[in-house]
Amino acid sequence: MNIIKCISLQTNYIWIIYNHIRQCIIIDPGESLKVIKMLNHLQLIPEAILLTHNHRDHTNGVFTLIQHFPKIKIYGPIETQNQNFATITVSEGDTLQILNQEIKVLNFPGHTPHHIGFYYKSWLFSGDTIFSAGCGTIQTGYTQAMYKSLLKIQCLPKNTLIYSGHEYTLLNLNFAISILPQDTLIINYLKKITKVLKKNKLLQPTTLQLELKINPFLRCNDINIQKSLNLFPKPGEEWKILQALRNKKDLYLVKN
């Protein structure tokens, strides 16, 4: 199986997986025009669309894709049922049989109430749950759910490749340094990424092994982060660190 990316709406990633006979799966098509052009250019035949959640920047392309490819099947969480297309509802415990491959569904509530991810071999399509050095915004009342979702990701094999829904790496690393200004690994990685982007090279995917080191949202038990926030939660309340980090990140985005 091969994977290619389609840049959409400035920061969105649409992922396309295809096999040796040019059949493909499209993940989170936020628009259709670029996807159709790419499919035509590579002579790919779409068999399925996978949706991680119901936000329009991940689903806007579905209706037009259905018109072009009427036999295509759409899989997504229950929250995608309210859109203008029919979806096969899936959740954790389901294994999709597509292109003679098995794709596992994982529940990642937090960014939205019924957000899901798709796990294929060592590839995780995480939607807006986790980004390189960051995580998605959290719906009100779902901080603890998001914390558990991030814990679930941390328990995956360390060689997992993470294909997320947006490219925010540079911004996320700068925020991480504002929390951990002495973290040499994050500082050096920011320098590396800055050079890559200056050469107009695209990023993604990242690895879980790397994210465990550079992503503050995966380090809620880290005493250095707790000191930076001046917040020392009781055992079992580490989600409060996630909440504090996300609040700071939201303010950081407003200022930057």
Curated annotation (Swiss-Prot):
Names of the cofactor(s): Zn(2+)
Annotated S-S bridges: none
BP terms from Gene Ontology: methylglyoxal catabolic process to D-lactate via S-lactoyl-glutathione
EC number(s) recorded for this UniProt protein: 3.1.2.6
Catalytic activity: an S-(2-hydroxyacyl)glutathione + H2O = a 2-hydroxy carboxylate + glutathione + H(+)
GO molecular function, one term: hydroxyacylglutathione hydrolase activity
Pfam families: HAGH_C, Lactamase_B
Keywords from the named record: Hydrolase, Metal-binding, Zinc
Stated family: Belongs to the metallo-beta-lactamase superfamily. Glyoxalase II family.
Quaternary structure and partners: Monomer.
UniProt function note: Thiolesterase that catalyzes the hydrolysis of S-D-lactoyl-glutathione to form glutathione and D-lactic acid.
NCBIfam families recorded: GSH_gloB
Full protein name: Hydroxyacylglutathione hydrolase
Organism of origin: Blochmanniella floridana
Gene: gloB
